[in-house]
Amino acid sequence: MLEDKINKVMGKVAQLNGDVYHESFYNPHPYPGWCPELKHIMWGFIKELKEKEAAGVATKVDLETLSELFDVIIRSSDMLLKNNEFKQKTKVFVKAVNAFNYKLLNALSEANGNEVKNVFVSPGRLQAMLVLLSNWVDWYYKRDRILDAICCKDMNPMEVNEMFADERYLIPYVNKEKMDEGYIPTIELKTMMWYKKGLNLSKRYLIDTEKPFHVLFKALDFDSPSASDNIKHLVKNASHGLINDLQIELTNETRALLVDVLYFKATWQSLFDEDCTRTRNFYYKGGSSKVKMMSVTDVFRYYENDTFQSISLDYHSHAKTRNYSMWIHLPKQGHKIKEVLAQITEEKIGTKYKQAEVHLNLPRFELESKTSLTEVLKVLGMEGIFASDDVIPNLLKDVKIDDIVQQGRIEVNEAGTEAAMATYCVMFTGCPPHEKPKPIEMKVNHEFIFEVVEAYTGIRLFSGFVNNL
């Protein structure tokens, strides 16, 4: 009888360990981590033990079993509380990542104006790089502005670090070995920082970011003819050949280069039949072009309103639930991408999808892009990191960010999707040592104004002007 109770509790704990996200296992009040089923077993056993004590038949084994049950339930409760905390943090984190995603897309759309231009970016990787940089900037000035611009102002800075460094939050299944070819997506991530040989990095901040953020730091002679080729070769390998030629220019002013490479490959849950692919028109502002249009009829998650249609194309996975999908948002006749962006920014599209049979025509496409994000980031409130000649003093002194760029490639066909994105930040010396600027000429040889000013408050102690001497 008692062994059966222990086994029942242990079985429930094992079940909880295997499915910690199942909503029914959470009792929101008063003990969030306690499973109601475990409590029922516990109180039932206590009642039985009290009856035995009242009858004078309680044994030492009964008491030991009670103690063991308490221990099991307390430990399982602690486990559930921790996972519930992880779940709540993830919600906050995902909200920030998605908010920045649409904030960046809207800014890029505004920057394009009426220009017919494709955009391919990875907002999450840009956001992650900016979080990494925020650890090296002046915390009391630029860091808050960075976190505000990337939609993380309401989060504790230490938690921001924890979440962006922990791959479970940002990219589930990243850098995992494939369980079976063609099923679980291949997702790989590498972050590297090259700095000029002879420069000294702060050991404290190097240690604080190297392991948590999985950054490979390496000294490099940027003046060497092979330096650029070495970097391009590593990026090519990290992107599985999709980014064949990273478009960087190293000069004798280059002091550091921070590069983040994300690679993704997956097959569709519902494959497109190549025999059904036909040549069709693709219309754009001012004209049309011939494309290979794929076709499939199947049950998909789908949503539409008066402005746009939206569909979720799932990728194959070993997980019990979907882990990666491609969402397509299609403006209806008379509506533009800007209008759709405005709506999907506000709406939680993922919660609106319903199962529906859809006949889908989707163009087979390949996009290659190189996008300088410097001006867009300035618009989003990060002028400070580009204006300073000593932008990351906590790690490396006297360097200036020249540009932040994303260069990538995506291929979408009947089998699935393959994509890679390199996010890189080029840093120059704040004041090139080989180029000493000429002093500005100022000859005070005619009338002038003078002021004696208190530096902190700006209060003028004395002011005046001189007309003659």
Please tell me what each predicted stretch does.
Residues 1-4, 62-65:
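Intrinsically disordered low-complexity regions specifically enriched for long asparagine
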Residues 3-23:
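Short terminal alpha-helical segments
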Residues 52:
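Surface-exposed receptor/substrate recognition regions of extracellular proteins
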Residues 12, 66-67:
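Compositionally biased, intrinsically disordered low-complexity regions
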Residues 18, 23-36, 40-44, 62, ...:
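Secretory/exported precursors with cleavable N-terminal leaders
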